[in-house]
Swiss-Prot record:
Described function: Trophic factor for dopamine neurons. Prevents the 6-hydroxydopamine (6-OHDA)-induced degeneration of dopaminergic neurons. When administered after 6-OHDA-lesioning, restores the dopaminergic function and prevents the degeneration of dopaminergic neurons in substantia nigra.
Assigned protein family: Belongs to the ARMET family.
Identification of the protein by name: Cerebral dopamine neurotrophic factor
Gene3D superfamilies registered for this protein in UniProt: SAP domain, Saposin-like
This protein's UniProt keywords: Disulfide bond, Growth factor, Secreted, Signal
Localization in the cell: Secreted
Disulfide partners: C37-C124, C40-C113, C71-C82
UniProt-recorded Gene Ontology molecular function terms: growth factor activity
Tissue: Expressed at high levels in the heart, skeletal muscle, testis and brain (at protein level). In the brain, detected in the cerebral cortex neurons through layers II to VI. In the hippocampus, detected in the CA1 to CA3 pyramidal regions and in the granule and polymorph layers of dentate gyrus. Weak expression in the striatum. In substantia nigra, detected in solitary cells that did not express tyrosine hydroxylase, a marker for dopaminergic neurons. Relatively high expression in the Purkinje cells of the cerebellum and in regions of the brain stem, including the locus coeruleus.
GO-annotated cellular components: extracellular region
Top-level taxon of the source organism: Eukaryota
Source organism of this protein record: Mus musculus
One Pfam family in the UniProt entry: ARMET_C
UniProt signal peptide: 1-24
Amino acid sequence: MRCISPTALVTFCAGFCISNPVLAQGLEAGVGPRADCEVCKEFLDRFYNSLLSRGIDFSADTIEKELLNFCSDAKGKENRLCYYLGATTDAATKILGEVTRPMSVHIPAVKICEKLKKMDSQICELKYGKKLDLASVDLWKMRVAELKQILQRWGEECRACAEKSDYVNLIRELAPKYVEIYPQTEL
């Protein structure tokens, strides 16, 4: 058997990684941790951290009850994730066990989401909308539908708004209340 020098081994491995397009693909700048299963990872991480901070018992049944409660407050893309998991009242399928069992033994959210992706690819297709910085955006240049979306995400509604100026004034009035809670609003 031949002995290989460490530099020859490193050179061989580096050449192999660069020549293999599948391995080199992960080295691209565009591939980031948020690129895949973004909603699933962030939602389950937040859920797991809330369980830890409240000192909840990590049994599958307890986690399932807490997940149902957590999903009852979810809105937007996170509500859609809860629907796919079966944690909403109108859900067609129920795969909560695929979340609660692994989480009861402290498996990271990334691994849980990868497993869920194999079961239902729609779960990882959910993406958060682009972020909107209310301090830098000109509300007058936005469409009324976009202004309504901002209010909807905040859980507010303007029944008396007839013109664009009414929506803009209401958003500016409510912004201090919600900018502290939601530093950047999704559009």
